[in-house]
């Protein structure tokens, strides 16, 4: 057994000592190249000592290296400061029956997500009592490393920490119903969002060539690539920062890849299904689908009796 803070006294060379690494993700994002280098060296130290049969522990005697099967992964940032989800894939919009307006090519448009309902890998996707059509969305997004305001695209690129998978879970029937008022979404989205399983840092990301796929119970339902987007990561962040402060640890989802949801396929997940979203280099975000919640007596509005089922409009 070897304590990390006692390595020097145990004769570890400089190359064998674990450097200080931020103990939470937003601080790690903000540590930049120095933090990334420290993290890589810490991993190298852990591998070296493991090969020698040393058990690394912290100052309190707790192990610092664990088997994957012995831990439960949370969302990379369980409660980001802010989450925005953009529409940047034309195939998703047209696949859902929308006609693209000039605004789509002029600027990236988003809605703000509920940061209090984010779940991580393996956690259950909540099925609200008020929907009969639960849906997944196959997305990729990025975290900001440092804050900024009025960033140029060139500057914005240096403020991006890395990417992860984002499942923008949707209650499609009520979402379409409420957005018929040209506002929202609200109850159609606010109940649950999944992200993970890890953050792939930008030094390993080619943002235009990430291959993505969605499987339900092991069956391939959808696939696509990030090259189909309208805007780059930096363009999205630059636009968001115009006359507005952006903070470290914010999350920017880039929207659903074309064909990357049940709504476009007219195919619907069911309670007990396992939804797996995969992105090359990032891994697989896997979540079970929960059972439909029972609506408590008197809860909600008596004027709402459920939305009609929705089906995507198909182009001839």
Where are these regions (language model features)?
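Active-site microenvironments in enzyme catalytic cores
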Residues: 3-216, 220, 308-316
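Generic structural signal for buried aliphatic residues
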Residues: 140, 252-253, 275
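Short, charged beta-turn/beta-strand-edge "cap" motif at the junction between a beta-strand
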Residues: 147-149, 257-261, 280-285
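Glycine-rich active-site loops that engage anionic ligands at enzyme catalytic sites
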Residues: 177, 197, 220-247
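A conserved acidic, glycine/proline-rich C-terminal tail/linker
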Residues: 232-270
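Glycine- and charge-enriched low-complexity intrinsically disordered segments
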Residues: 283-316
């Amino acid at each position: 057994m070897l304590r990390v803070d006692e390595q020097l006294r145990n004769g570890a060379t400089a190359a064998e000592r674990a450097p200080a690494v931020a103990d939470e993700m937003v601080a790690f994002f903000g540590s930049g190249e120095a933090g990334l280098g420290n993290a890589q060296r810490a991993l190298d130290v852990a591998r070296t000592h493991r090969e020698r049969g040393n058990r690394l522990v912290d100052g309190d005697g707790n192990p610092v290296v664990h088997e994957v099967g012995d831990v439960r992964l949370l969302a990379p940032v369980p409660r980001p400061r802010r989450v925005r989800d953009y529409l940047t894939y034309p195939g998703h919009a047209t696949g859902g029956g929308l006609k693209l307006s000039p605004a789509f090519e002029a600027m990236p448009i988003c809605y703000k997500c509920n940061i209090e309902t984010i779940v991580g890998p393996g956690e259950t996707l909540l099925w609200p009592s008020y929907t009969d059509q639960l849906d997944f969305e196959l997305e990729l997004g990025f975290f900001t490393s440092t804050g900024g305001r009025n960033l140029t695209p060139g500057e914005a690129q240096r403020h991006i920490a890395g990417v992860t998978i984002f499942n923008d879970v949707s209650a499609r029937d009520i979402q379409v119903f409420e957005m018929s008022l040209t506002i929202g979404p609200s109850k159609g989205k606010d109940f649950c969002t999944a992200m993970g399983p890890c953050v792939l840092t930008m030094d390993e990301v080619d943002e235009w060539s990430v291959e993505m796929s969605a499987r339900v119970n092991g069956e391939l339902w959808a696939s696509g690539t990030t090259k189909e987007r309208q805007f780059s990561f930096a363009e999205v962040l630059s636009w968001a920062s115009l006359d507005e402060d952006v903070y470290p640890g914010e999350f920017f989802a880039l929207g659903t890849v074309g064909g990357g949801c049940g709504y476009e396929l007219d195919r619907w997940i069911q309670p007990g299904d396992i939804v797996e979203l995969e992105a090359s280099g990032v891994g697989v975000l896997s979540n079970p689908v929960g059972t439909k919640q029972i609506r408590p007596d008197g809860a909600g509005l008596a004027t709402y009796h459920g939305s009609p089922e929705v089906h995507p409009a198909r182009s001839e």
